[in-house]
Amino acid sequence: MQQDKVNLLGLNQKAIEDFFISIGEKKFHARQVFKWIHKKGVIDFDAMTDLGKNLRHKLKEKAQITIPKVVFSKASKDGTHKWLIDVGGSAVETVFIPEEGRGTLCVSSQVGCTLNCSFCSTGKQGFNRNLSAAEVIAQLWIAARTLSKTDGEHDFTVTNIVMMGMGEPLMNFENVVPAMDIMMDDLAYGLSRRKVTLSTSGVVPRIYDLLEQSGVSLAVSLHAPNDMLRNEIVPINKKYNIDELLEACKLYAQNGPHKHITFEYTLMEEVNDNLSDAEELVALLKSREVPAKINLIPFNPYPGTPYKKPSNNRIHRFKEFLQHNGFVTTVRKTRGDDIDAACGQLAGDVMDKTNRKQRYLKKLGDTNAN
């Protein structure tokens, strides 16, 4: 029986070195190939000109570099770019957001999501599977290779990564961490820990593991100032409550790259956007002594949701109260809404688990017909 070829795309530097040793080759050859793949974007062994002919032949027998197919891509009028990527018959989305002086890539970690937060469109798809490390890093590989550096108006260089796409990254820890290792490797994309941010809904044990094994920047999807409300809208809170979550956050802030935690708070009208909610949030964070920045996210409605986006006045009032009480507070701009790329819309054309494959196949058929 022929052994399956190893996909080198998802191997971090140590793993690819171990693979080369296992086939009787030297570590420095592994580093050469690693650099070819990620720094230069080359996936054809024959094009790796500093490798000997015998080594290239051996690699073709024992390894492969497989990039997922891009089903389609869309560019927004504001410069935002979205890709729908085929991951073995299912699809995930990746979004690039250009801003002045930076370009942020929002990366998915799962097909669907297990956590079923009540306001999240991705959660309504149900959960299919975790992405492999290769499928995670492929999103950056594709973006880095297909974006032009500039169109005269927008800068299209990826400078920051946010693990905030489809899925809960800490529920796919074993694949997400090696992929982030590649993102931060100087032989690959060379991003610093400050430039790679993982967002979690609060898988508390894995927050401690993340600090020990990776130490990237941490963002926490809080969305509520008390357990009663958070139990309702972020169900994982029933397993790991706010006290446990903030205890982990405090330790992470003390040892992480930013010395603070970014708390994401999706504002939903008359659900969690009242002044009393802001007061409770301030009291909560001050009492737990967690160094915090707060990122307010106006809710983006999607078909079938009972929630509404607050008025600008309510958003401004909430922000002003937090700032007045000493918290650095930002309001996330709505970006890419004309291509369904804004936060909360990452389900896009693959809205629910039942119809995901049919929708994907239809999109693939439409693409091939053009």
From Swiss-Prot:
InterPro entries: Aldolase_TIM, Elp3/MiaA/NifB-like_rSAM, Methyltransferase_A, RlmN_N, RNA_MTrfase_RlmN, rRNA_lsu_MTrfase_RlmN/Cfr, rSAM. Its EC number is 2.1.1.192. One of its GO terms (cellular component) is cytoplasm. It catalyses: adenosine(2503) in 23S rRNA + 2 reduced [2Fe-2S]-[ferredoxin] + 2 S-adenosyl-L-methionine = 2-methyladenosine(2503) in 23S rRNA + 5'-deoxyadenosine + L-methionine + 2 oxidized [2Fe-2S]-[ferredoxin] + S-adenosyl-L-homocysteine; adenosine(37) in tRNA + 2 reduced [2Fe-2S]-[ferredoxin] + 2 S-adenosyl-L-methionine = 2-methyladenosine(37) in tRNA + 5'-deoxyadenosine + L-methionine + 2 oxidized [2Fe-2S]-[ferredoxin] + S-adenosyl-L-homocysteine. The keyword Iron applies. S-adenosyl-L-methionine binds at residues 167-168, 199, 221-223, 300. Specifically methylates position 2 of adenine 2503 in 23S rRNA and position 2 of adenine 37 in tRNAs. m2A2503 modification seems to play a crucial role in the proofreading step occurring at the peptidyl transferase center and thus would serve to optimize ribosomal fidelity. Reaction proceeds by a ping-pong mechanism involving intermediate methylation of a conserved cysteine residue. HAMAP family: RNA_methyltr_RlmN. PANTHER family: 23S RRNA METHYLTRANSFERASE, RADICAL SAM CORE DOMAIN-CONTAINING PROTEIN. This is Dual-specificity RNA methyltransferase RlmN. It comes from Francisella tularensis subsp. mediasiatica (strain FSC147).
